[in-house]
Design a protein with these regions (language model features):
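Non-catalytic architectural context of zinc metalloproteases
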Residues: 1-89, 102-105, 132
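Acidic/polar loop patches that form or flank catalytic/metal-binding clefts of enzymes
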Residues: 1-3, 89-91, 151-152, 181
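Beta-sheet entry/capping signal
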Residues: 52, 90-95, 112-114, 133
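Short, flexible loop/turn elements at secondary-structure junctions
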Residues: 57-61, 96-100, 117-121, 162
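Short, solvent-exposed turn/loop segments enriched in Gly/Ser/Thr/Pro and often Arg
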Residues: 90-101, 146-148
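Short acidic/His/Gly/Ser-rich catalytic and metal-binding motifs that mark active-site loops
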Residues: 103-106, 151-153
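Aromatic-lined, polymer-binding surfaces characteristic
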Residues: 104-111, 170
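Zinc-dependent metallopeptidase catalytic helix centered on the HExxH motif
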Residues: 113-181
Length: 181
């Protein structure tokens, strides 16, 4: 499994269980979890604020990530560092579900992103060209949309409605920066 949440210490006495350290409701809601039988984790950057790629797939063959793709993702992290100048997260995890059985989409979080893409996205370059730009888009959202939010999209609690008058601006900028990276 993978998530932005930190495991609690000490480890649970029951094998196969996980406990997480206490967090605020806001952090909990903003921390999706990815798990699966066919699972792989790759380091994209091992700095003090690391970036990790966590992948769950319908089939084990989909986890054979092409070295060129790993290199491109590592370059994405380096280029984002150059663009933004710092990392405002403790660590970041790309949570990627490779499946042709679920709806494909991306969802930003502050210290992770949930990315559902076609099962062959990492093994077929043509499919990857279509599917994988969502990773750059969601990574940019960590800065543009989570760390800094447009007026009206930052609310004091989950009961207050968001006003998305400027949503098109921040989504457009995020899309542009994702393509640049």
């Amino acid at each position: 499994f993978a998530t932005a949440l930190e495991a609690a210490a000490p480890a649970p006495a029951v094998p196969g269980t996980v406990r997480f350290a206490p967090v605020s409701l806001t952090t909990l809601v903003d921390s999706p979890l990815l798990a699966g039988r066919n699972f792989q984790r790759l380091s994209l950057d091992e700095s003090p604020r690391p970036v990790v790629l966590a992948v769950a797939a319908d089939g084990a063959a989909a986890l054979q990530i092409r070295p060129e793709t790993v290199k491109q993702l590592r370059n994405l992290v380096r280029e984002a560092d150059a663009l933004f100048g710092s990392r405002q997260f403790r660590r970041y995890t790309f949570l990627v579900a490779l499946s042709d059985q679920v709806t494909q989409f991306g969802l930003e979080s502050h210290e992770s992103s949930e990315n559902r893409v076609a099962e062959s996205s990492f093994t077929n370059p043509a499919v990857g060209m279509l599917e994988l730009p969502v990773l750059a888009h969601e990574y940019v959202h960590s800065w543009n949309g989570k760390y800094r939010r447009p007026d009206g999209l930052a609310t004091p609690d989950f009961q207050a409605p968001m006003r998305g008058d400027l949503l098109w601006v921040y989504e457009g900028l995020t899309q542009y920066l994702g393509q640049v990276l």
